[in-house]
From Swiss-Prot:
It comes from Escherichia coli O7:K1 (strain IAI39 / ExPEC). The lineage of its organism: Bacteria, Pseudomonadati, Pseudomonadota, Gammaproteobacteria, Enterobacterales. Signal peptide: none annotated. GO terms for biological process: 3-phenylpropionate catabolic process. This is 3-phenylpropionate-dihydrodiol/cinnamic acid-dihydrodiol dehydrogenase. Keywords: Aromatic hydrocarbons catabolism, NAD, Oxidoreductase. Pathway: Aromatic compound metabolism; 3-phenylpropanoate degradation. Belongs to the short-chain dehydrogenases/reductases (SDR) family. NAD(+) binds at residues 10-34. The gene is hcaB.
């Protein structure tokens, strides 16, 4: 039996991409899974696909009341919360400083930081009491942009660096009761969108990148699928497998940190 059997897991942005892969994986692990999802169509799809195995709540990650509403339903259903996974986010499609008009830069900043940083802060505030009671954990999705330049423009990169600082501070404030960690995936096949302020709300990441371009920059030389990144979340959520990690950022970058100067990888001809 999985360590996560009957554990209560709350995931944001569970309707597509990495969020959907996490929903699938934690249900496979036997957990009681809930998600807060902005899209009504995706909420309906989740309910149709997973039935009683999912509690799908329509809501906005920048709204504290929506977290409270979802938590009320989670606690009524499960009586507890063991792990919160802050996953919903938006990307800036590499919008650069020089090529972004000043007024758009300002409105784009507020929209992107509201989702990627304030959303995480509000979720932590809402979930902390239940997680303190269960001595559970929080996990937040980062990005390779939390470590390296070029994984987004200045807005996205700054937001992921801010999220890293938030994780460390929350880990400090909530210890010893709650473990707080992050997972930073590299580019993958997903429906990740951009800010409306930048005119990117209907543009997904795969409209800006191709599988070939993503695979080419990775030393492991493959095009990642969302399911490829679920393992670290399962490990961090497990009390048995993770008693000792808090304030840790797992860099799941398919080898970006070991790219060579002359070649992406030295073993391409092996």
């Amino acid at each position: 039996m999985s360590d996560l059997h009957n554990e209560s897991i709350f995931i944001t942005g569970g309707g597509s991409g990495l969020g959907l892969a996490l929903v699938e994986r934690f249900i496979e692990e036997g957990a009681q899974v809930a998600t807060l999802e902005l899209s009504a169509a995706k909420v309906a799809s989740l309910r149709q696909r997973f039935g009683e195995h999912i509690l799908a709540v329509e809501g906005n990650v920048t709204c504290y009341a929506d977290y409270q509403r979802a938590l009320d339903q989670i606690l009524t259903r499960s009586g507890k919360l063991d792990c919160f996974i802050g996953n919903a986010g938006i990307w800036d499609h590499n919008a650069s400083l020089v090529n972004t008009p000043a007024e758009t830069l300002e409105t784009g900043f507020h929209e992107l930081f509201n989702v990627n940083v304030l959303g995480y802060l509000l979720s932590a505030k809402a979930c902390a009491p239940a997680l303190i009671a269960s001595e559970g954990s929080m996990i937040f999705t980062l990005s390779n942009a939390a470590w390296y330049p070029g994984g987004g423009g200045p807005l996205y990169t700054a937001s992921k660096h801010a999220a890293t600082g938030l994780i460390r501070q929350l880990a400090y404030e909530l210890a010893p009761k709650v473990r707080v960690n992050g997972v930073g995936p590299c580019g993958m096949a997903s429906d990740l969108r951009g800010p409306q302020a930048l005119g990117q709300s209907e543009t997904s990441i795969m409209q800006s990148l191709t599988p070939e371009k993503i695979a080419a920059i990775l030393p492991l030389q493959f095009f990642p699928q969302p399911a490829d990144f679920t393992g670290p979340y399962v490990m961090l959520a497990s009390r048995r497998n993770n008693r000792a990690l808090s304030g840790v950022m797992i860099n799941a970058d398919a080898g970006l940190a070991i790219r060579g100067i002359r070649h992406v990888a030295a073993g391409l001809d092996l």
